Amino acid sequence: MDCDGLRDDQWERIRGFVPGGTKGKRGPRTNNRLFLDALLWMARSGGRWRDLPERLGDYRAVKRRYYRWIEMGVLDEMLAVLAREADLEWLMIDSTIVRAHQHAAGARRAKGGRMPRAWVGLEAG
């Protein structure tokens, strides 16, 4: 298996969303899993369609199919269901790991005090 592609368990989760059968009007369809691997490659690399490796299929066919799936709402439906099923309990952003630029230390303070102007009225009342 290619490290850029879907794992077997990932493919099984999204297999039901993939339209089409095994044979199209003009012959055998392109492998759906290979097509999704091509989309993942595009998302990860940020490359152009023409840069798609040949092992993932003809870039013109992948591009056409991508726009067909967008029009049919296949990818929207797939992402909506996967987002609902996502286990985000483990997800946490820890600011001790994230480094900020030295000039990103904070906003400038207003003259005459440490509190933002919008909070001054709240403290007085």
Swiss-Prot record:
GO terms for biological process: transposition. InterPro entries: IS402-like_dom (IPR025161), Transposase_6_like (IPR052909). It holds the Pfam family DUF4096. The keyword Cell inner membrane does not apply. Keywords: Plasmid, Transposable element, Transposition. To transposase of insertion sequence IS6501. This is Uncharacterized protein y4sN. The lineage of its organism: Bacteria, Pseudomonadati, Pseudomonadota, Alphaproteobacteria, Hyphomicrobiales.
